Regions:
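Positively charged n-region of N-terminal signal peptides that target proteins for export
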Residues: 1-5
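Bacterial Sec-dependent signal peptides at the C-terminal "C-region" and cleavage site
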Residues: 12-25
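Beta1/beta-strand and adjacent pyrophosphate-binding region of the FAD-binding site
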Residues: 23-34
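Core beta-strand elements of the Rossmann-like FAD/NAD(P) dinucleotide-binding domain
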Residues: 26, 155-165
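N-terminal Rossmann-fold NAD(P) dinucleotide-binding loop
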Residues: 37
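Rossmann-like dinucleotide-binding core of oxidoreductases
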Residues: 177-237
Length: 237
């Protein structure tokens, strides 16, 4: 009886250790829940890898959703892959592919909140994929073949994660910088790139800000009075 009891205790201890280890170890760790981070996470999970996405906000989709730039550029004759799945979900929601053509900048336009909802639905069905929202990477180390990341949670607690593979899904290259990868800011000169359209001298110019607005037709004039100090010429393109 004593041996049986000791055996049960040992089995419980091993099970507890294994479960604890699985909580802080993943095959693939993705920092950033933008469109690239989400799709990388979905594909990784579908290939059987235990995957974790760490995202600073409540949203998924990055530029396509939380930034409001919900207009997809590209070749619309390539409807396959994860983008194809995302587009089909949009078409199902809005009533067909033609319903996505609501602007002149893209053939795939949608409300940011709808895109966020669809990304969450696509993530939720993947059993090998977890998402930590309101979480921020605060420290990153590399020991032999393992990445060790310290993640600050919403309640300010720190969780340590071990991962075999690390993916930068921040859209700004934040993790690449943290890893010491060399980078440039701005536009390279034509002498660096051998491109005729490049400037003669390199500069620190970055892409201009994009103002995004979702418009609704109320069927009547609902124009508000001009605010004090408003000058429309300041917003002319």
């Amino acid at each position: 009886m004593r041996n049986y009891f000791l055996g049960l205790c040992l089995l419980f201890a091993l099970c507890f250790t294994a479960c604890s280890h699985s909580d802080d170890s993943v095959d693939v760790l993705i920092i950033g829940g933008g469109a690239s981070g989400v799709t990388a996470g979905i594909q990784s999970a579908r290939m059987g890898a235990a995957t974790l996405i760490v995202e600073e906000t409540e949203w998924l989709g990055g530029m396509l959703t939380s930034a409001g730039v919900s207009a997809v550029d590209g070749n619309y004759d390539l409807p396959a892959g994860l983008f194809g799945e995302f587009r089909e979900h949009l078409a199902d929601y809005y009533g067909g592919l033609d319903s996505l053509k609501t602007g002149w900048v893209s053939a795939v336009l949608f409300e940011p909140s709808v895109g966020n909802k669809i990304f969450h639905e696509m993530v939720d069905v993947e059993k090998n994929l977890k998402v930590w929202h309101n979480a921020t990477l605060v420290k990153l180390e590399r020991e032999k073949d393992v990445w060790i990341a310290q993640i600050q949670m919403k309640d300010n607690t720190i969780k340590k994660i071990h991962a075999k593979i690390l993916i930068d899904g921040t859209e700004l290259g934040d993790i690449a910088k943290m890893c010491g990868v060399e980078y440039d800011v701005g536009m390279e000169s034509r002498h660096d790139t051998k491109e005729d359209i490049a400037p003669e001298e390199k500069n620190n110019i970055v892409q201009d800000i994009t103002y995004v607005a979702i418009l609704k037709d109320y069927g009547k004039d609902v124009t508000i009075p001009c605010p004090e100090g408003y000058n429309k010429d300041e917003f002319a393109c």
